């Protein structure tokens, strides 16, 4: 069975798609291009209106592709998590809708679809971080946590992905070490909010220091920092750790107190 994975949305979805690819390859499936695929897995975003519209349009496009090429079609990701029942009713042509946190279940789900079963399966928020990635590209997106506790008025992430969950530091460091040994030159730390990471008192800054001390010729990039928790300790770490890029991804609305207040 040849499988093509098409990913929409943010870098965190890219990480999830890599996890799906890894578990399927270990189960004996082949990851291929769209032209060679017998099955398409569409990993969607469901965060804001344009992302939802893109996801719906992609579902429609792959339904047309399914009709012309006879492939199986699985839709997963945030849109499937958020609107599971509605999507299942609206798009009967789709062979499976799968919520988030089900990465390790994909071999079973794929086999059920192959047997002709239509699978409608909600996500498991307790299992968002329990998966492995084999590939070590030059730029490696390393997820350190999932979910969020901020609950801003405008944001659907806690609704979709639940409260903050963090990975054990030793697991993060081991994954980084494997990636670096495999040729990765840029480790990109991703989370809903990197500054919210805390594992039994071990903070984002502690993690940066330990990552910086790993052997190898690489650098570290930070994405998705909430400015409320960017303190002097964080600034000092970013400034002084040689492998950490002097860069932070912070939404522009955070420069305006009035906008922040209205956002919650």
State the predicted function of each range.
Residues 1-195, 233, 248:
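Proteins enriched for Cys/Gly/acidic motifs involved in redox and nucleic-acid/cofactor modification
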Residues 73-77, 82, 87, 181-264:
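Conserved SAM/AdoMet-binding glycine-rich loop
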């Amino acid at each position: 069975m040849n499988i093509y994975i098409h990913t929409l949305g943010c870098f965190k979805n890219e990480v999830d798609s890599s996890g799906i690819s890894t578990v399927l390859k270990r189960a004996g499936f082949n990851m291929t291009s769209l032209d060679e695929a017998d099955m398409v897995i569409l990993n969607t975003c469901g965060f804001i209106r344009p992302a939802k519209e893109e996801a719906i349009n992609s579902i429609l496009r792959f339904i047309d592709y399914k009709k012309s090429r006879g492939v199986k079609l699985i839709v997963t990701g945030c849109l499937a998590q958020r609107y599971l029942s509605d999507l299942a009713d609206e798009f009967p042509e789709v062979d499976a809708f799968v919520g988030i946190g089900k990465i390790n279940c994909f071999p079973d789900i794929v086999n059920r679809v192959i047997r002709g079963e239509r699978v409608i399966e909600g996500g498991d928020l307790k299992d968002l971080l329990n998966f492995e990635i084999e590939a070590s590209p030059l730029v490696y997106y390393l997820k350190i946590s999932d979910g969020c506790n901020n609950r801003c008025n405008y944001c659907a992430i806690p609704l979709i992905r639940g409260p903050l969950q963090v990975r054990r530091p030793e697991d993060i460091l081991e994954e980084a070490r494997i990636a670096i040994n495999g040729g990765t030159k840029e480790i990109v730390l991703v989370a809903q909010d990197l500054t919210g990471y805390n594992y039994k008192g071990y903070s984002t800054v502690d993690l940066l220091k330990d990552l910086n001390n790993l052997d190898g010729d690489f650098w570290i990039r930070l994405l998705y920092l909430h400015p409320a928790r960017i303190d002097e300790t964080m600034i000092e770490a970013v400034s002084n750790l040689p492998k950490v890029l002097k860069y932070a991804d912070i939404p522009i609305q955070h420069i305006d107190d009035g906008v922040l207040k209205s956002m919650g």
